[in-house]
């Protein structure tokens, strides 16, 4: 297998592998580098890494039997431009990068992985944990060369020639849990090798008897950044630095998806175009100073060495931080980070061997491995290092001279986007001064300046949105609740012939009577058993009711005390329970809550003066005269002001009676202020209603101390309704009172269930139909005043509202006494609108959604849905006609309606069909009338989404339109 690495990672590979494998050798007798001819291939028993002058940004690594050379070939001959590497890959190690294996495995890995484990994303990519505490054995790296398959590269041969006194050196410091400082010190040998510099090319030749260390110390400063915009190029280094070419762009990270990425290519052992290095020059004097810096693009490589007191190679690049393997234990947190003691071998500054390569990541904030993060290229960081004020000296046993070794650290600054709720610490760079103040070193702290620029990405760990708030209800119609609770499914259906002729009604009634007789006998037999079980069930029900009342009391208590903020889900749910729960239960619990809140404040039902006198009478110690001032202060400055209303329910002087429609009734409520300060109050009436009008004399104001104020409430019922609603009286610094209103209007033709209405027979095109008597009266008045010939009938409102209210109250009791066509037409619409349960509401919404209208009615659906103001969202009512399915026939849907309601609905369809016959006069066609009446016949339930509600409204229009057309064809 051929592994291709991008050029940006080659610096890291050279720093971590090349030293360990003795790629770079130095002669003990000469400072010159030997070279071979540029075109000569390496020997069969050696391995070579060839730096070609080809502009390709990748380098290919393959296998050779043994040995290792560095060969730079300006001609770019692909035949010799390889380093052969025997690779044995398994599934686990294929998921890790080369840098991860080198950084995380205490032993030499058996293969080189080519990709990152997807599970590694569960760990933070910007996390650097404690310093390594695991030290591998001395020969772990070199013993693998004895195997037949050499895993990483051609290892150092003839290891028996190594000096035994060097075997105690730590060659690899690693930890499976964390990033670490990798110190690789190659052994020395007395054998010599020659290095030559020829024509800008370097050929380092080594034999089995010649193993020499490199002539320098590499100190790597790696700044890993993620940035959206390309980095500005760094300034060119001085003559003491290695200049890297500018014509090759190096990506910041190694990723499988990038163009110059870490990939595997089994079919091609050579790069398409090897990397190009124009110049490579080394000048070595007494003290070596090599500096390698990488800008955004590479152009040249220049290596110089001057006679200064620094011996250093600085590599600045963007290299991805290796992550620990997934199988390892999770990285420790910041609290349990440990750093090696100064006496550890990793921290010794006295190097018996020649200079070594050191990679030292710093301490960094950590995150729990359970959090899922991913890196986001959002920030670019530039690290500027200043030289130490007093550099130390290190004794080298190889040349017996002092070499200055400055201490550097690896600063990593990344910006991540976290998708979990785990909090992160600040990712500021941390300077690791582990070599400071050691027995063999007198380093001063390294001065560092970090400049960060770029836009930071917002964290994605935003809290999830709150659940939708339950809408508040200020009023309910108890008649509708009664109908909703007693409504049953419809089981009787008729065919299209029965739709026209309902002569089978009597037969059905006879069958039902027989069934009822049988059911009565069964019920009599079961009465005794049920009575025996009722006693035990009643006890259980009582316990459940008590528990429910206790929970309801706690909610009411918090509601009255103001612990629930308005327009919140808890506030609205508790507020709605005031309307849903039995009124006697709500009143008793509210009174209990008011008393508990006032008593908890030491107020109770007494005034401040009465409380003071009661407290003084209970005092048995006559010497407690000094407590008078504190008692007065407590009485004056209560936590909750003692203000109470005279009543908590408004009957409008008609308890147990009905209220006439369109007649104003008045009731009053007195607010008593028992506190010793002026109190502000506010009355909340809620939004206006279509069924009634309620007003108060003063919506807000002040109540003087020890005084009271009277609030007058007026109510006008506009339709037949059994009303229950809530009025709120808020006391600033006191209790929030909820005043219940429950009244019932006189029974009229409007607002009554069809089942409870007086039904009479009326002739239609479908045959005789039983409909409410009020509709028959309105129909006669409608055609009597030629309303069917009036333009825009059923569309325009009545001309006089007062006349409209009068006529509405007269319907079904006496002659309506009006000839205004729009008033009569509006009353017909209002009759269907004010039904407790609309005519078509018993039909399942799925039936309307699946209804497929004909082509003509389908064209009407989209425009009808747009005109229907009761729906919102977007939908398309258009559908291809399909009359093959009998369940989609309009007659089938009509049969789903209960019998009395079905007769009323068909009566309306017949009336609308009759009006459309005079379209030339009234300008109202079937489409217009269907759009007008659809919201008065069906309202989509709240469980339907906005899109479905919008679609259903269009289907209802098409359904009504097809029935009108069907009636006109009869």
Curated annotation (Swiss-Prot):
Residues 30-49, 258-285, 312-446, 487-550, 860-886 are annotated as: Disordered. Residues 754-970 form the Rho-GAP domain. It is found in: Cytoplasm. Residues 321-333 have a biased composition (Pro residues). SUPFAM superfamilies: GTPase activation domain, GAP. Residues 1-20 form the signal peptide. Rho GTPase-activating protein involved in the signal transduction pathway. This is Rho GTPase-activating protein gacK. It comes from Dictyostelium discoideum (Social amoeba).
């Amino acid at each position: 297998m051929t592994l291709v690495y991008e050029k940006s990672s080659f610096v890291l590979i050279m720093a971590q592998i090349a030293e360990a494998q003795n790629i770079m050798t130095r002669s003990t007798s000469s400072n010159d580098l030997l070279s071979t001819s540029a075109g000569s291939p390496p020997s069969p028993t050696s391995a070579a890494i060839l730096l070609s002058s080809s502009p390709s940004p990748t380098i290919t690594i393959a296998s050779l039997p043994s040995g290792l050379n560095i060969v730079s070939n300006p001609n770019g001959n692909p035949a010799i431009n390889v380093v052969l590497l025997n690779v044995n890959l398994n599934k686990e190690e294929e998921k890790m990068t080369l840098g991860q294996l080198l950084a995380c495995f205490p032993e030499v890995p058996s293969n080189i992985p080519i990709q990152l484990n997807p599970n590694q994303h569960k760990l933070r990519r910007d996390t650097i944990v404690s310093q390594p505490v695991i030290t591998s054995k001395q020969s772990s790296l070199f013993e693998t060369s004895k195997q037949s398959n050499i895993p990483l590269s051609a290892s150092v041969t003839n290891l028996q020639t190594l000096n035994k006194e060097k075997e105690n050196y730590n060659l690899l410091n690693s930890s499976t849990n964390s990033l670490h400082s990798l110190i690789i010190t190659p052994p020395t040998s007395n054998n010599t090798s020659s290095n030559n510099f020829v024509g800008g090319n370097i050929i380092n030749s080594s034999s089995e008897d010649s193993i020499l260390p490199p002539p320098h110390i590499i100190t790597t400063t790696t700044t890993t950044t993620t940035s959206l915009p390309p980095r500005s190029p760094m300034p060119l280094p001085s003559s003491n630095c290695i200049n890297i070419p500018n014509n090759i762009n190096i990506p910041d990270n190694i990723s499988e998806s990038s163009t110059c990425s870490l990939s595997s290519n089994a079919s091609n052992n050579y790069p398409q175009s090897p990397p190009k290095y124009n110049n490579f020059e080394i000048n070595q004097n007494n003290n070596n100073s090599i500096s390698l810096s990488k800008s955004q693009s590479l152009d040249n490589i220049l290596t110089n060495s001057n006679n200064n007191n620094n011996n250093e190679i600085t590599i600045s690049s963007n290299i991805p931080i290796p992550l620990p393997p997934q199988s390892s234990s999770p990285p420790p947190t910041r609290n349990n980070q440990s750093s090696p003691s100064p006496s550890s071998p990793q921290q010794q500054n006295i190097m018996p061997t020649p200079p070594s390569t050191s990679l030292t990541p710093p301490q960094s904030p950590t995150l729990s491995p359970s959090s899922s993060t991913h890196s986001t290229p959002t920030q670019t960081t530039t690290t500027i290092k200043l030289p130490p004020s007093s550099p130390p000296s290190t004794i080298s046993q190889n040349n017996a001279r002092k070499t200055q070794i400055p201490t550097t650290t690896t600063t990593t600054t990344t910006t991540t986007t976290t998708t979990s709720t785990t909090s992160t610490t600040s990712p500021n760079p941390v300077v690791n001064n582990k070599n400071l103040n050691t027995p063999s070193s007198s380093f001063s702290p390294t001065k560092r300046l970090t400049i960060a620029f770029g836009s930071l990405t917002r964290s994605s760990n935003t809290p999830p949105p709150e659940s939708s708030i339950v809408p508040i209800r200020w009023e309910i119609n108890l008649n509708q609740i009664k109908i909703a609770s007693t409504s049953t499914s419809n089981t009787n259906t008729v065919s299209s012939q029965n739709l026209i002729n309902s002569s089978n009604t009597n037969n059905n009634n006879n069958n039902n009577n027989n069934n009822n007789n049988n059911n009565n006998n069964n019920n009599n037999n079961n009465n005794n058993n049920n009575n025996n079980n009722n006693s035990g069930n009643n006890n259980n029900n009582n316990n459940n009711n008590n528990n429910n009342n206790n929970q309801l009391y706690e909610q009411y208590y918090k509601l009255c005390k103001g612990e629930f903020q308005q327009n919140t889900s808890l506030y609205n749910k508790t507020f709605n329970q005031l309307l849903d729960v039995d009124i006697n239960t709500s009143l008793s619990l509210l009174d209990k809550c008011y008393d508990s809140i006032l008593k908890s404040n030491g107020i109770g039902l007494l005034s401040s003066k009465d409380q003071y006198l009661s407290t003084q009478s209970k005092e048995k110690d006559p010497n407690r005269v000094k407590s008078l001032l504190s008692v007065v202060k407590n009485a004056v400055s209560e936590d909750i002001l003692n203000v109470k209303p005279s009543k908590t329910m408004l009957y409008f002087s008609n308890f147990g009676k009905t209220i006439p429609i369109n007649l104003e009734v008045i009731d009053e409520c007195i607010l008593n202020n028992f506190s010793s300060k002026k109190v502000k109050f506010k009355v909340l009436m809620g939004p206006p209603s279509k069924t009634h009008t309620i007003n108060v004399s003063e919506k807000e104001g002040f109540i003087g101390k020890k005084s009271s104020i009277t609030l007058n409430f007026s109510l006008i019922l506009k339709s037949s309704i059994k009303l229950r609603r809530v009025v709120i009286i808020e006391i600033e610094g006191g209790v929030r009172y909820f005043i219940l209103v429950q009244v019932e209007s006189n029974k009229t033709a409007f607002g009554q269930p069809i089942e409870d209405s007086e039904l009479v027979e009326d002739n239609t095109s479908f045959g005789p139909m039983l409909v409410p008597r009020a509709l028959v009266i309105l129909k006669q008045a409608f055609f009597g005043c030629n309303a069917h010939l009036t333009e825009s009938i059923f569309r325009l409102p009545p001309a006089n509202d007062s006349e409209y209210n009068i006529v509405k109250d007269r319907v079904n009791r006496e002659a309506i006494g009006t000839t205004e066509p729009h008033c009569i037409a509006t009353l017909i619409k209002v009759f269907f609108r004010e039904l407790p349960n609309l005519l078509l509401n018993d039909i399942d919404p799925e039936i309307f959604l699946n209804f497929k209208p004909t082509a003509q009615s389908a064209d009407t659906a989209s425009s009808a849905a747009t005109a229907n103001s009761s729906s919102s969202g977007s939908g398309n009512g258009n559908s291809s006609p399909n009359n093959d399915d009998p369940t989609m026939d309009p007659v089938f849907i009509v049969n789903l309606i209960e019998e009395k309601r079905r007769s009323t609905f068909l009566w309306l369809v017949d009336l609308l069909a009759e009006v459309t016959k005079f379209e030339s006069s009234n300008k109202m066609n079937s489409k217009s009338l269907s759009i007008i009446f659809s919201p008065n016949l069906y309202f989509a339930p709240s469980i339907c989404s906005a899109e479905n509600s919008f679609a259903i409204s269009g289907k209802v229009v098409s359904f009504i339109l097809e029935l009108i057309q069907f009636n006109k064809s009869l």
